[in-house]
From Swiss-Prot:
Gene: CEACAM16
An example Gene Ontology molecular-function term: identical protein binding
Protein name in UniProt: Cell adhesion molecule CEACAM16
Subcellular location: Secreted
Cross-referenced InterPro entries: CEA_cell_adhesion, Ig-like_dom, Ig-like_dom_sf, Ig-like_fold, Ig_sub, Ig_sub2, Ig_V-set
Family: Belongs to the immunoglobulin superfamily. CEA family.
Disulphide bonds in the chain: C153-C201, C252-C293
Keywords: Deafness, Disease variant, Disulfide bond, Glycoprotein, Immunoglobulin domain, Non-syndromic deafness, Repeat, Secreted, Signal
PANTHER family linked to this entry: CARCINOEMBRYONIC ANTIGEN-RELATED CELL ADHESION MOLECULE 1 (PTHR44427:SF1), CARCINOEMBRYONIC ANTIGEN-RELATED CELL ADHESION MOLECULE 19 (PTHR44427)
Coiled-coil stretches: none
Subunit: Homooligomer; can for homodimers and homotetramers. Interacts with TECTA and TECTB.
UniProt cross-references to Gene3D superfamilies, sorted A to Z: Immunoglobulins
This protein's record includes keyword Signal: yes
């Protein structure tokens, strides 16, 4: 009786299964998507009449891939045939361009001339070529110790293994503790500044690996350790001593991300300066006081401050006169700046020459009222701090100038300065 097609299946149901000698190996052993794969059969014995291959856990007709009659070479596809399978004369099964859906258990059933049947089992695991994953973040800018970081490795391959990278290396221990059981979600409560950087995830299987593009995380913090630094001047604790008519630059520094906004105050009054430094171009007694820098972080909504006291140096406290500029030329204005004038001043007077000659009086300032003297040319202006402005200098302004001061206690002091006016050209 000649049997073809599914009739072998009906016969196979009436005979006992014997011996488990058949073994099946896979070539290649770890196939990837698109490979040509062979389920190689070993241990066939006796003269066989037919083979049947099943792609499933049982010998159900619904799992039948194909039946093959040895004597004629006829192959009959079954319900589970995908168009890629072919049975070899030796019983092996070829699968062309294998796909992940071909993964699973395969059963070979053989029939001999005594109509006895044997079965062999094999397993196919097809590893797909992995697409590049993507890291998804709840936010890429977080506030330290306040916000939670949540990253997810998004991949169309649910069976792929996942590993994470931080700045190209392994995750720190604290971050590894926040991984989900499947490794696809990374959570970190109370993010730290040292955890700012580039994060990547990588998916892999035995035949393929793919890493995501980095996602960069910024962690905002501060301001902390706000301090005021200065250039080369004498400092004792929070007090800075400055020579008269010299310049001073104060720098406000802090640890902060992002860079904070700055506000400077002088003796409690806000200054029009939003920079990280403050320049005092020409130090006088009027600039003595407390300077405060306030640093404000617009992301963390935190702020910090530092203060210093700026004073004239001990050497500058003694009364002296300094021309500003020190080498004036014809046509310029010059200010005879008084350093260390008496705090209890009652009256002062400027003379063009010695104070012993009344006709040399330029101006005087008793009780806050400025009065011009006989030697006044209309170009001189006196100030409450004893300084004298001489405008539009000419060469005849060269010579001695004398300042006479009288305190409330009646103490009189006389100070002289020689003014040199350089000609133009």
């Amino acid at each position: 009786m000649a049997l073809t097609g599914y009739s072998w299946l009906l016969l196979s149901a009436t005979f006992l299964n014997v011996g488990a000698e058949i073994s099946i190996t896979l070539e290649p052993a770890q196939p990837s998507e698109g490979d040509n794969v062979t389920l190689v059969v070993h241990g066939l014995s006796g003269e066989l009449l037919a083979y049947s291959w099943y792609a499933g856990p049982t010998l159900s007709v619904s799992y039948l891939v194909a039946s093959y009659i040895v004597s004629t070479g006829d192959e009959t596809p079954g319900p589970a045939h995908t168009g890629r399978e072919a049975v070899r004369p030796d019983g092996s099964l070829d699968i062309q361009g294998i796909l992940p859906r071909h993964s699973g258990t395969y059963i070979l059933q053989t029939f001999n001339r005594q109509l006895q049947t044997e079965v062999g089992y094999g397993h196919v695991q097809v590893h797909e070529i992995l697409a590049q994953p993507t890291v998804l973040a709840n936010s890429t800018a977080l506030v330290e110790r306040r916000d939670t970081l949540r990253l997810m490795c998004s991949s169309p391959s649910p069976t792929a293994e996942v590993r994470w990278f931080f700045n190209g290396g392994a995750l720190p221990v604290a971050l590894r503790l926040g991984l989900s059981p499947d490794g696809r979600v990374l959570a970190r409560h109370g993010i730290r500044r040292e955890e700012a950087g580039a994060y990547q995830c990588e998916v892999w299987n035995p035949v393929s690996v793919s890493r995501s593009e980095p996602i960069n995380l910024t962690v905002y913090f501060g301001p902390e350790r706000v301090a005021i630094l200065q250039d080369s001047t004498t400092r004792t604790g929070c007090t800075i001593k400055v020579d008269f008519n010299t310049s001073l630059t104060l720098w406000c520094v802090s640890r902060s991300c992002p860079e904070p906004e700055y506000v400077w105050t002088f003796n409690g009054q806000a200054l029009k300066n939003g920079q990280d430094h403050l320049n005092i171009s020409s130090m006088t007694a009027a600039q003595e006081g407390t300077y405060t820098c306030i640093a404000k972080n617009t992301k963390t909504l935190l702020s910090g401050s530092a203060s210093v006291v700026v004073k004239l140096s001990a050497a500058a406290v003694a009364t002296m006169i300094v021309p500003v500029p020190t080498k004036p030329t014809e046509g310029q204005d010059v200010t005879l700046t008084v350093q260390g004038y008496p705090k209890d001043l009652l009256v002062y007077a400027w003379y063009r020459g010695p104070a012993s000659e009344p006709n040399r009086l330029l101006s005087q300032l008793p009780s806050g009222t400025w009065i011009a003297g006989p030697a006044h040319t209309g170009r001189e202006v006196g100030f409450p701090n004893c300084s004298l402005l001489v405008q539009k200098l000419n060469l005849t302004d060269t010579g001695r100038y004398t300042l006479k001061t009288v305190t409330v206690q009646g103490k009189t002091e006389t100070l002289e300065v020689e003014l040199q006016v350089a000609p133009l050209g």
